A protein has these predicted regions:
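Short, acidic/polar linear motifs in exposed loop/turn regions
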Residues: 163-165, 306
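Beta-strand-rich interaction surfaces with strong enrichment in secreted/lumenal proteins
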Residues: 74, 144-146, 285-290
Length: 316
Protein backbone atom coordinates (compact mmCIF):
# COMPACT_ATOMS: atom_id res chain seq x y z
CA UNK A 1 0.00 0.00 0.00
CA UNK A 2 1.35 3.42 -0.93
CA UNK A 3 1.81 6.20 1.60
CA UNK A 4 -1.35 8.33 1.84
CA UNK A 5 -1.79 11.83 0.45
CA UNK A 6 -4.31 14.50 1.42
CA UNK A 7 -6.76 13.09 -1.11
CA UNK A 8 -6.82 9.86 0.89
CA UNK A 9 -8.22 11.44 4.07
CA UNK A 10 -11.79 10.38 3.31
CA UNK A 11 -10.73 6.77 2.74
CA UNK A 12 -8.56 6.82 5.89
CA UNK A 13 -11.45 8.11 7.97
CA UNK A 14 -13.74 5.39 6.62
CA UNK A 15 -11.26 2.60 7.31
CA UNK A 16 -9.40 3.76 10.43
CA UNK A 17 -11.31 6.75 11.78
CA UNK A 18 -13.84 7.15 14.56
CA UNK A 19 -15.74 10.45 14.90
CA UNK A 20 -14.36 12.52 17.75
CA UNK A 21 -11.69 9.93 18.56
CA UNK A 22 -9.55 9.27 15.46
CA UNK A 23 -9.78 11.83 12.66
CA UNK A 24 -7.57 12.27 9.59
CA UNK A 25 -7.31 15.75 8.12
CA UNK A 26 -5.26 17.24 5.27
CA UNK A 27 -2.15 19.37 5.66
CA UNK A 28 -0.31 21.74 3.35
CA UNK A 29 2.42 19.10 3.04
CA UNK A 30 0.06 16.81 1.07
CA UNK A 31 0.34 14.24 3.83
CA UNK A 32 -2.51 13.81 6.32
CA UNK A 33 -2.44 14.50 10.04
CA UNK A 34 -4.22 12.14 12.41
CA UNK A 35 -5.88 13.59 15.51
CA UNK A 36 -6.26 11.26 18.50
CA UNK A 37 -8.62 12.28 21.31
CA UNK A 38 -10.44 10.97 24.36
CA UNK A 39 -11.41 12.08 27.85
CA UNK A 40 -7.76 12.33 28.90
CA UNK A 41 -6.42 14.54 26.14
CA UNK A 42 -5.50 14.83 22.49
CA UNK A 43 -2.51 14.49 20.18
CA UNK A 44 -1.75 15.22 16.53
CA UNK A 45 0.58 13.03 14.47
CA UNK A 46 1.83 13.90 10.99
CA UNK A 47 2.06 10.96 8.59
CA UNK A 48 5.08 12.67 7.06
CA UNK A 49 7.86 11.53 9.36
CA UNK A 50 5.41 9.96 11.86
CA UNK A 51 6.12 13.05 13.93
CA UNK A 52 3.91 13.79 16.91
CA UNK A 53 3.12 17.49 16.59
CA UNK A 54 1.12 18.14 19.72
CA UNK A 55 -0.04 16.57 22.95
CA UNK A 56 -2.41 18.28 25.36
CA UNK A 57 -3.86 16.61 28.46
CA UNK A 58 -7.43 17.69 29.12
CA UNK A 59 -7.57 20.91 31.13
CA UNK A 60 -3.80 21.44 31.03
CA UNK A 61 -1.30 23.41 28.92
CA UNK A 62 0.28 21.80 25.84
CA UNK A 63 3.20 19.50 26.64
CA UNK A 64 5.11 19.80 23.35
CA UNK A 65 6.85 22.81 21.83
CA UNK A 66 6.32 23.64 18.15
CA UNK A 67 8.04 26.84 16.93
CA UNK A 68 5.69 27.44 14.00
CA UNK A 69 2.33 26.02 12.92
CA UNK A 70 2.96 22.83 10.96
CA UNK A 71 1.33 24.14 7.79
CA UNK A 72 3.67 27.14 7.77
CA UNK A 73 6.83 25.04 7.51
CA UNK A 74 8.33 24.32 4.06
CA UNK A 75 7.40 20.97 2.55
CA UNK A 76 9.94 18.30 3.47
CA UNK A 77 11.78 20.52 5.96
CA UNK A 78 13.00 19.40 9.37
CA UNK A 79 10.40 20.16 12.02
CA UNK A 80 12.23 21.31 15.16
CA UNK A 81 9.40 20.59 17.56
CA UNK A 82 6.96 17.95 18.70
CA UNK A 83 8.54 14.49 18.80
CA UNK A 84 10.71 13.57 15.80
CA UNK A 85 11.49 9.88 15.27
CA UNK A 86 15.26 9.50 14.75
CA UNK A 87 16.15 6.29 12.90
CA UNK A 88 18.44 4.54 11.79
CA UNK A 89 20.95 7.07 13.00
CA UNK A 90 20.88 9.67 15.72
CA UNK A 91 22.34 13.17 15.29
CA UNK A 92 24.94 13.40 12.51
CA UNK A 93 26.32 9.86 12.54
CA UNK A 94 24.78 8.78 9.21
CA UNK A 95 26.61 8.35 5.91
CA UNK A 96 28.57 11.31 4.55
CA UNK A 97 26.24 14.04 3.31
CA UNK A 98 23.17 12.51 4.95
CA UNK A 99 20.42 14.44 6.69
CA UNK A 100 20.24 14.92 10.44
CA UNK A 101 18.69 12.11 12.51
CA UNK A 102 18.07 9.47 9.84
CA UNK A 103 15.59 8.67 7.09
CA UNK A 104 12.40 7.97 9.07
CA UNK A 105 11.60 11.63 9.77
CA UNK A 106 11.71 12.51 6.06
CA UNK A 107 9.50 9.67 4.80
CA UNK A 108 5.77 9.24 4.30
CA UNK A 109 4.40 6.58 6.64
CA UNK A 110 1.38 4.33 6.04
CA UNK A 111 -1.51 3.73 8.40
CA UNK A 112 -1.92 0.05 9.26
CA UNK A 113 -4.29 0.09 12.19
CA UNK A 114 -6.24 2.02 14.80
CA UNK A 115 -8.26 1.20 17.87
CA UNK A 116 -9.96 2.89 20.75
CA UNK A 117 -11.67 2.11 24.01
CA UNK A 118 -13.03 4.21 26.82
CA UNK A 119 -9.52 4.92 28.09
CA UNK A 120 -7.14 4.59 25.10
CA UNK A 121 -7.00 5.95 21.54
CA UNK A 122 -4.27 4.55 19.28
CA UNK A 123 -2.99 4.64 15.71
CA UNK A 124 -0.38 2.34 14.14
CA UNK A 125 1.93 3.61 11.40
CA UNK A 126 4.43 1.72 9.26
CA UNK A 127 7.43 2.44 7.07
CA UNK A 128 9.38 -0.01 4.91
CA UNK A 129 12.63 0.44 3.04
CA UNK A 130 12.25 1.40 -0.62
CA UNK A 131 14.28 2.91 -3.43
CA UNK A 132 14.19 6.32 -1.75
CA UNK A 133 15.50 5.14 1.64
CA UNK A 134 18.17 3.04 -0.09
CA UNK A 135 19.65 6.22 -1.57
CA UNK A 136 20.53 7.34 1.96
CA UNK A 137 20.94 3.99 3.74
CA UNK A 138 21.30 0.75 1.73
CA UNK A 139 19.52 -1.72 4.01
CA UNK A 140 16.11 -3.42 4.13
CA UNK A 141 13.99 -2.70 7.18
CA UNK A 142 10.45 -2.36 8.50
CA UNK A 143 9.35 0.12 11.15
CA UNK A 144 6.13 0.12 13.14
CA UNK A 145 5.15 3.02 15.38
CA UNK A 146 2.18 2.91 17.75
CA UNK A 147 1.07 6.27 19.17
CA UNK A 148 -1.56 6.19 21.90
CA UNK A 149 -3.30 8.70 24.13
CA UNK A 150 -4.53 7.60 27.54
CA UNK A 151 -3.69 9.19 30.88
CA UNK A 152 -0.31 9.57 29.17
CA UNK A 153 1.12 9.80 25.67
CA UNK A 154 2.94 6.63 24.58
CA UNK A 155 5.15 6.01 21.55
CA UNK A 156 6.32 2.46 20.79
CA UNK A 157 8.73 1.94 17.88
CA UNK A 158 9.63 -1.54 16.60
CA UNK A 159 12.46 -1.86 14.07
CA UNK A 160 12.93 -5.11 12.14
CA UNK A 161 15.75 -6.16 9.83
CA UNK A 162 13.99 -7.55 6.74
CA UNK A 163 17.19 -7.96 4.74
CA UNK A 164 19.90 -10.61 4.47
CA UNK A 165 22.72 -8.73 6.22
CA UNK A 166 23.10 -7.34 9.73
CA UNK A 167 23.16 -3.58 10.24
CA UNK A 168 23.98 -1.16 13.05
CA UNK A 169 21.42 1.30 14.39
CA UNK A 170 21.41 4.38 16.56
CA UNK A 171 17.98 5.85 17.25
CA UNK A 172 15.88 7.96 19.53
CA UNK A 173 12.75 9.89 20.30
CA UNK A 174 13.55 13.62 20.32
CA UNK A 175 10.74 15.31 22.31
CA UNK A 176 10.73 19.10 22.57
CA UNK A 177 8.99 19.82 25.86
CA UNK A 178 7.30 23.19 26.24
CA UNK A 179 8.46 25.15 29.31
CA UNK A 180 7.83 28.65 30.63
CA UNK A 181 11.56 29.45 30.85
CA UNK A 182 14.49 27.12 30.26
CA UNK A 183 16.34 28.57 33.26
CA UNK A 184 13.48 27.54 35.55
CA UNK A 185 13.76 23.84 34.74
CA UNK A 186 15.67 20.83 35.99
CA UNK A 187 15.82 17.14 35.16
CA UNK A 188 15.49 14.46 37.85
CA UNK A 189 16.54 10.84 37.47
CA UNK A 190 20.15 11.38 36.40
CA UNK A 191 21.79 11.33 39.84
CA UNK A 192 24.70 8.88 39.82
CA UNK A 193 24.70 8.46 36.03
CA UNK A 194 27.91 8.63 34.06
CA UNK A 195 27.74 11.37 31.43
CA UNK A 196 29.58 13.36 28.81
CA UNK A 197 29.17 17.06 28.04
CA UNK A 198 29.38 18.06 24.37
CA UNK A 199 30.56 21.59 25.23
CA UNK A 200 32.94 20.87 28.08
CA UNK A 201 36.66 21.37 27.43
CA UNK A 202 37.35 18.01 29.10
CA UNK A 203 35.85 15.21 27.00
CA UNK A 204 36.03 12.29 29.40
CA UNK A 205 33.20 10.44 31.15
CA UNK A 206 32.25 11.77 34.57
CA UNK A 207 29.59 10.99 37.18
CA UNK A 208 26.65 13.33 37.68
CA UNK A 209 25.43 14.23 41.17
CA UNK A 210 21.90 15.39 41.93
CA UNK A 211 19.40 16.83 39.47
CA UNK A 212 20.41 18.76 36.33
CA UNK A 213 19.38 22.42 36.44
CA UNK A 214 19.23 23.41 32.75
CA UNK A 215 21.02 26.73 32.43
CA UNK A 216 23.31 26.48 29.40
CA UNK A 217 23.40 25.47 25.76
CA UNK A 218 24.58 22.07 24.58
CA UNK A 219 23.92 18.43 25.37
CA UNK A 220 24.43 16.31 28.43
CA UNK A 221 24.55 12.63 27.39
CA UNK A 222 23.74 10.33 30.30
CA UNK A 223 24.35 6.59 30.48
CA UNK A 224 21.10 5.38 32.00
CA UNK A 225 19.82 2.17 33.57
CA UNK A 226 16.72 3.27 35.51
CA UNK A 227 15.05 5.01 32.52
CA UNK A 228 12.67 7.08 34.60
CA UNK A 229 13.08 10.84 34.43
CA UNK A 230 11.19 13.98 35.38
CA UNK A 231 11.44 17.41 33.77
CA UNK A 232 10.51 19.89 36.48
CA UNK A 233 9.09 23.11 35.03
CA UNK A 234 8.97 25.53 37.94
CA UNK A 235 7.69 28.32 35.68
CA UNK A 236 4.53 26.41 34.76
CA UNK A 237 4.49 24.60 38.11
CA UNK A 238 4.30 21.18 36.51
CA UNK A 239 6.32 18.00 36.19
CA UNK A 240 6.67 16.03 32.95
CA UNK A 241 7.42 12.40 33.73
CA UNK A 242 9.19 10.36 31.05
CA UNK A 243 9.54 6.58 31.21
CA UNK A 244 11.45 4.75 28.49
CA UNK A 245 12.59 1.27 27.49
CA UNK A 246 15.10 0.11 24.90
CA UNK A 247 17.46 3.08 25.16
CA UNK A 248 20.96 3.15 26.62
CA UNK A 249 21.31 6.94 26.77
CA UNK A 250 19.38 10.05 27.72
CA UNK A 251 20.25 13.34 26.02
CA UNK A 252 19.20 16.63 27.61
CA UNK A 253 19.60 19.43 25.06
CA UNK A 254 18.90 23.09 24.47
CA UNK A 255 20.58 25.16 21.72
CA UNK A 256 20.92 28.32 23.78
CA UNK A 257 20.96 31.91 22.64
CA UNK A 258 24.42 31.69 21.11
CA UNK A 259 23.55 29.06 18.51
CA UNK A 260 22.97 31.41 15.59
CA UNK A 261 22.23 28.59 13.18
CA UNK A 262 19.12 27.78 15.21
CA UNK A 263 17.56 31.25 15.03
CA UNK A 264 15.70 30.51 11.80
CA UNK A 265 14.26 27.33 13.28
CA UNK A 266 13.20 28.67 16.66
CA UNK A 267 12.96 32.43 16.27
CA UNK A 268 14.99 34.91 18.28
CA UNK A 269 14.09 33.62 21.74
CA UNK A 270 12.43 30.28 21.03
CA UNK A 271 15.28 28.47 22.79
CA UNK A 272 14.00 29.83 26.10
CA UNK A 273 10.75 27.88 25.86
CA UNK A 274 11.74 24.25 25.40
CA UNK A 275 13.99 21.55 26.79
CA UNK A 276 14.64 18.29 24.96
CA UNK A 277 14.79 15.14 27.11
CA UNK A 278 15.59 12.40 24.61
CA UNK A 279 15.59 8.62 25.23
CA UNK A 280 18.05 7.39 22.62
CA UNK A 281 20.99 5.27 21.57
CA UNK A 282 23.74 7.68 20.61
CA UNK A 283 26.60 7.32 18.10
CA UNK A 284 28.94 5.65 20.59
CA UNK A 285 28.80 2.12 21.93
CA UNK A 286 25.14 2.68 22.85
CA UNK A 287 23.86 1.63 19.41
CA UNK A 288 22.80 -1.91 18.59
CA UNK A 289 23.17 -4.49 15.82
CA UNK A 290 20.17 -6.14 14.16
CA UNK A 291 20.67 -9.46 12.42
CA UNK A 292 18.31 -10.55 9.62
CA UNK A 293 14.86 -11.19 11.09
CA UNK A 294 15.63 -9.55 14.43
CA UNK A 295 13.63 -6.70 15.95
CA UNK A 296 14.28 -4.02 18.55
CA UNK A 297 11.73 -2.04 20.56
CA UNK A 298 12.04 1.55 21.79
CA UNK A 299 9.28 2.91 24.03
CA UNK A 300 8.57 6.27 25.63
CA UNK A 301 5.64 7.28 27.83
CA UNK A 302 5.03 10.92 28.79
CA UNK A 303 2.75 12.18 31.53
CA UNK A 304 2.25 15.77 32.69
CA UNK A 305 1.21 16.35 36.29
CA UNK A 306 0.95 19.45 38.50
CA UNK A 307 4.00 20.04 40.67
CA UNK A 308 2.12 19.71 43.93
CA UNK A 309 5.17 18.88 46.01
CA UNK A 310 4.93 15.11 45.56
CA UNK A 311 7.91 15.25 43.18
CA UNK A 312 10.95 16.70 44.90
CA UNK A 313 13.96 18.23 43.18
CA UNK A 314 17.40 17.14 44.32
CA UNK A 315 20.03 19.76 43.72
CA UNK A 316 23.74 18.89 43.52
Amino acid sequence: MKAPRNADCEALNRRFGAPGRIVFRPSKHDAPIVVLANQYGSAEVALFGAQTLSYRPTGNPPVLYLPHPYDETPAGAEIHGGIPVCWPWFARCGPAGSKLHGVARYARWRVTGSEYSEDVTEVTLALESDAETWKAWPHDFALELKVSVSMKLTLALRATNTGTEAFHVTEGFHPYFLVRERDQTEVLGVDGCEFTDTRAPEKGVRTWTGSYAVREAGSKIYQVTKREYVLMDHGLNRAIAVVSRGNARLVVWNPGEESADQVAAFGVDGWRHFVCVEPCSTPDEAGYDLKPGESHDLLMAVQSVPNDGSVHARHP
